[in-house]
């Protein structure tokens, strides 16, 4: 399929889970894809290249400004431009009472999940402005950006912050032809969630019971929403937080 033919997209957090599924979907739709992760996704990019797609891997710490700037530049140096970005990189911390949180844990989560989104948007937008072209950016929040859960204060704060960044920046760039939106995934089958199913089984069991559709989501189900938000089919969608959660947050 060629819905994204001649387009260039950055996908962060592309080593696995939703990020990898999104990178694979964009590649299959004809885009040239920069797979970005703190742990460089060399094999994941090579698998796409071996399948006949256009891809590169880039090691990047999204919480570090120079690393993010270099990542965007390498993408442009390789593919000649930038059209879209899915800022997906994020980390989780163990369930912890707010007063028991360590400062370094708070800082780590906020630096990756919120500051990282800001830095990625900053350099992606600078590149789109330099090109003078339209484009689209999708940021990964979470159902944790819409609700609260006891023991998840810093993670949920970081994901609420993503929505604030998304909505405000979307207003800044709507008139410039650059659309910015967010996805809010629910409980997705990813390595991070699979680990939580083991380490926090009681809490996850209770959460699963509250999902109306009665199952975990597949990473590909989120990827398809990201693809749609970047496509011309979503040309009038700006500053929105799209839940992909099996009905969890409408209860």
Stretches with model-predicted labels:
Residues 174, 179, 237-239:
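Short, small/polar-rich loop/turn modules that mediate ligand/substrate recognition or access, typified
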Residues 96-98, 102-108, 207:
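Substrate-binding pocket helix/loop in short-chain dehydrogenase/reductase
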Residues 92-95, 147, 227, 238-251:
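Short C-terminal tail/terminal secondary-structure segment
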Residues 121, 158, 166:
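Active-site helix of classical SDR
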Residues 15-16:
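Conserved glycine-rich cofactor-binding loop
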Residues 29-43:
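Conserved glycine-rich Rossmann-like NAD(P)H-binding loop of the short-chain dehydrogenase/reductase
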Residues 142:
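Residue(s) in the substrate-gating loop at a strand-loop-helix junction
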